[in-house]
Amino acid sequence: MRLHTAPLLLITALTAAAQQPAPVSASAQFQAIQSRLLASHAASDWLANLAAAQDQQALLNDDPAALLEVARAEVHIRDVHLNGDIAAIRELQQFVRMGQSTDFIEKTPDFATLRNRPEYADLQRDMAANRAPIALAATALVLPDANLLAEDIDVDTARHRFLITSVREHKIVAVSVTNSASAPAAITDFAPAPDPWPIVAIKIDRTRSRVWATESAMQGLSFSPKSDWGRTAVLCYDLRTGKLLRRVEGPHGSAFGDMLLLPNGDVIVSDGDGGGLYRLASNPASPDHLDRIDHGEFISPQTPALAPDGHRLFVPDYERGLAILDLTTQKVSWLAPQGRFALNGIDGLYCNRNQLIAVQNGTSPERVILFTLDAPLATIVSEKIIERATPTLGDPTHGVLIGRDFYYIANSGWDILDAHGNINSGAKPSQPRIMRATVPGPQPSTGSSPRQ
């Protein structure tokens, strides 16, 4: 589940976290840095602002928006640091190399001096290229219910159907895999949420005939009663009947938005609001206890993906990028963006041997992309965009890999909502569209290759 609060100072102001004790977790560090950015910006203390922006850049592993913060500060200190404009240009060039585009550089007065530099035309040209449509997927099916706010999807292979979660209608629906794309598909209700909350993540345990899902009364959003905001739970249904078998509530203030099913049937859920990763044993005889398996390294973890060795998780953090979590040692490391790969804003993530398929609704532009890793799965060597800037791509969320075909929700509907989950004035929900892209088989990855 994507981060629905604005992440960086470029977009919003943060609450006064600076009065809190010295930060330990990544979330606390992030809040403290944001407070420094806000205070130094208000005081026009650009040297302090640059220091805070660089700390944020380091914490967020070269998140593209963090690069813009650094560039802005560098422009403002050009009278103190004569190379400020040149340094800012370098940050913006890296932003563009990462496949990003923004009108912020053109519209804000902060970058006015850069617009007179010879490099600016190249930046504009390259950002325009980054906005060019790419369409390697085709429509697989269209759901007739435009009010679903479809979030996650998995496949029940035995019954040839997709199960799809609905945020707005608080349920899981079923739709046949064999539906034609030429007409809206027939959908049926699989199971309701036990509470008046959105159902968010879903994973099907075909071996044990179970459906795992999460429900979440998301803070500040109109989809749930205000009295329930901050509550969340893991759910388990019978795959055949849709009967609710288990409900395990998470810590208050959490939002279980994404999920991974392990081969032994255990479930990993991520808390995009509180920054935690939790493991729930599948054995019904086990206590309904959620074990936290991280140590505060994450700000907003999203959909984990299991590496082929079965011992490591790829964990996308909406803010910090792509992490690798060792399930045995719980040690966390981060994939390097290498100045050219944007790894932030990933909502759905799926592993296919040495490939990672990512649904990025937090990049600019939003996109569905395939990353190829080296043999040890420690370094990204190339990327291939599946879909970007097309009429069918609204706000993509999650997908499922069936053989070499990747099916994904292309236009969930989040992009027409305001900060409280209400439909923007004049906007009209569209029918959810499931796209299908054939993913190339894993390729040898012994060397580096350019962006594709």
Annotate each PLM feature:
Residues 73-75, 101-127:
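TPR/TPR-like alpha-solenoid helical repeat scaffolds
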Residues 167, 216-218, 272-274, 282, ...:
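Short loop/turn segments immediately following the C-termini of beta-strands
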Residues 131-135, 139-173, 430-432:
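Beta-strand-rich domains and repeat architectures in extracellular enzymes and scaffolds
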Residues 137-144, 182-192, 243-249, 287-296, ...:
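A short beta-strand motif characteristic of beta-propeller blades
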